[in-house]
């Protein structure tokens, strides 16, 4: 049986009354995502996810490589954390976060651009995945992938189907929850192929035959773009 992703222009039911509908201020919707230069000093929180904070696996004075595991998940509801830069660990201590609250972080002084062994930096898109479902989930868990929403829910937990249960379909959330956000929009436009390949891999991971991508009607270009890719490359649906 062929797996299918559903990309349709379909109106969904909404609340009949009530709700708050703030004005959209998608000021950056037409601007491409650009990489920022690497900072000289980074503070990496040990809690970038809902659940238990990760446990630091490095100490002051250690040299680390980009992509290296520097903090390990503690329990099922937790997530691994990796170094975003190569350099020297300057401290493992509580540091004020963006909200002014102190939380444990690993501070790294950047030096060079060396990567951990086994990190695949080839930009070419790999469309084939011969991993078993359990292996896919293990890769996601080891990578420390979490949701980008406010809850930052560990992705391997989301994809863990309870024993005796079976999922009917995979739902991908392409809806932006705040008036100024455009990151989902730009991702669908700039990385549509990668997105659809990722969807097929997740479908395999949870053994479903259908996937739905939810996109707001204020993103007609994203809907058209993903639909075009989906139609022109049907092999990506299998």
Predicted region positions:
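Single conserved hydrophobic/aromatic residue that forms the stacking wall/gate
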Residues: 1-7, 229-238
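Acidic, glycine-anchored pre-beta loop/turn
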Residues: 5, 58-64, 96
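N-terminal, Lys/Arg-enriched amphipathic/low-complexity engagement segments
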Residues: 8-57
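Active-site-adjacent bridging/hinge elements
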Residues: 41, 61-64, 169-176
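Short, conserved secondary-structure segments in the cores of folded domains
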Residues: 54, 60, 77-80
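Short, well-structured beta-strand-loop connectors
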Residues: 59-72, 91
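Iron-sulfur-associated redox domains of electron-transfer enzymes in respiratory
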Residues: 77-83, 91-232, 236
């Amino acid at each position: 049986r062929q797996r299918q992703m559903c990309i349709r222009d379909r109106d969904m039911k909404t609340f009949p009354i009530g709700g708050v509908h703030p004005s959209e201020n998608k000021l950056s919707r037409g601007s491409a995502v650009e990489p920022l230069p690497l900072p000289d000093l980074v503070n990496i929180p040990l809690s970038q996810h809902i659940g238990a904070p990760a446990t630091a696996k490095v100490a002051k004075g250690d040299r680390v490589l980009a992509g290296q595991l520097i903090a390990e998940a503690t329990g099922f509801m937790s997530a691994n954390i990796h170094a975003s830069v190569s350099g020297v660990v300057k401290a493992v201590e509580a540091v004020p976060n963006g909200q002014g609250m102190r939380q444990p972080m690993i501070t790294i002084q950047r030096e060079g651009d060396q990567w951990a062994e086994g990190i695949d930096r080839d930009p070419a898109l790999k469309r084939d995945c011969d991993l078993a479902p359990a292996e896919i989930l293990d890769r996601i868990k080891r990578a420390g992938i979490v949701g980008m929403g406010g809850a930052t829910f560990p992705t391997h937990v989301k994809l863990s189907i309870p024993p005796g249960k079976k999922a009917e379909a995979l739902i991908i959330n392409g809806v932006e929850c705040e008036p100024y956000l455009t990151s989902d929009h730009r991702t669908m436009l700039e990385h549509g192929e990668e997105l659809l390949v990722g969807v097929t891999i997740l479908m395999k991971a949870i053994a479903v035959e259908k996937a739905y991508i939810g996109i707001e009607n204020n993103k007609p270009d994203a809907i058209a773009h993903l639909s075009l890719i989906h139609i022109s490359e049907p092999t990506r649906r299998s």
